[in-house]
Amino acid sequence: MKFAILFGGNSYEHEISIVSAVVLKKVINQNLEFIFCDEERRFYHIPSEKMNSKTFSTKAYKKEKELFIKQGGFFSKGFLKENKLECECVINLIHGRDGEDGKIAALFEFYSIKFIGPRLEASVLSFNKELTKLYAKSVGVKTLDYTILRKNQNSKEKLSFPCIIKPARLGSSIGISIVKDEKDLEYAKDVGFEFDNDLVVEEFKNNIKEYNLAGCMINDEFVFSIIEEPKKKEFLDFEQKYLSFSGHNELIEADLSEELKEKLKDSFKKIYNPLFKGALIRCDFFILDNEIYLNEINPNPGSLANYLFKDFNTTLNALADQISLEKMIKINYNFLHSINGQKGKL
């Protein structure tokens, strides 16, 4: 399977997406194409040998061929014709806005481009942490109790401390604060509201265990990664999350009973099927008093959580093989023909 990796985007997670693409280049042992979406949402074809931080930090990518999108794929302008970028499937590796909020999914479905990533409805529900909690509840998966703070609205909710405050539509731990008492609350709200108009507030629990599980559905069968118990302090910061998906830190397979492992997989299945078909996702769970709680859904996990799979390349290729394009509707204009055949034509 010939893949193209789409990365970048107009997102607070733009740089982590670049790092993710560089890491995935090293992981996927096959011929790849690289499509960079810059902050102006223009697409560039990046040669494999130029996939490094300097290409992007110095804006040298602007010297590369610019791509445009139309029915069936990405194209560049040649001297006498348009040249199509040769790939069979695009991997959506844009983290945060653009890649995970539904814009790319809608664009690819509209232009009949085969891709690995969340579809429109899945993107919308997983991008917003408030909607994620409502969705999880609807499919029978528990989440921690929460409060929503909205910008420019005076909330009368009484918060308990310590608590954790998260922007509703951001990942990579950006804008997150742990608030230990009321005197730190206003500052934490100011930080969060710099990134989002809605904040999710949860009680911070010291005795909670976190576990990550990635997977996908291939030919109606689930393929799971190992279950990871990440090393962390109070929460994973930006740097820790980079280290985790780049394979530079020690991977700890969770020491759990078979019963709890099956409970985690069962919760994953409820979240994934059928909404996330076509995507390889990672779900982050909490376990508290032997109960499973969904923390968040990562619809485009960093480097697609390759470090959690024993045979990542086989899984990725098998997933791509079974993705099909949306069936096009045949328009025959019979109704308009019938009108034209009558008196008083339209």
Swiss-Prot record:
Keywords: ATP-binding, Cell shape, Cell wall biogenesis/degradation, Cytoplasm, Ligase, Magnesium, Manganese, Metal-binding, Nucleotide-binding, Peptidoglycan synthesis. It is found in: Cytoplasm. One of its GO terms (molecular function) is metal ion binding. Gene3D superfamilies: 3.40.50.20, ATP-grasp fold, A domain, ATP-grasp fold, B domain. Its cofactor is Mg(2+); Mn(2+). Mg(2+) 2 binds at E296, N298. InterPro entries: ATP-grasp, ATP_grasp_subdomain_1, D-Ala_lig_Van_CS, D_ala_D_ala, Dala_Dala_lig_C, Dala_Dala_lig_N, PreATP-grasp_dom_sf. Pathway: Cell wall biogenesis; peptidoglycan biosynthesis. Its main location: cytoplasm. ATP binds at residues 159-211. GO terms for cellular component: cytoplasm. Its EC number is 6.3.2.4. It catalyses: 2 D-alanine + ATP = D-alanyl-D-alanine + ADP + phosphate + H(+). Pfam families: Dala_Dala_lig_C (PF07478), Dala_Dala_lig_N (PF01820). Mg(2+) 1 binds at D284, E296. Residues 133-327 form the ATP-grasp domain. Binds 2 magnesium or manganese ions per subunit. It is an enzyme of class 6 (ligase). GO terms for biological process: cell wall organization; peptidoglycan biosynthetic process; regulation of cell shape. Belongs to the D-alanine--D-alanine ligase family. Cell wall formation. NCBIfam families: D_ala_D_alaTIGR, PRK01966.1-3. This is D-alanine--D-alanine ligase. It comes from Campylobacter jejuni subsp. jejuni serotype O:2 (strain ATCC 700819 / NCTC 11168). The lineage of its organism: Bacteria, Pseudomonadati, Campylobacterota, Epsilonproteobacteria, Campylobacterales.
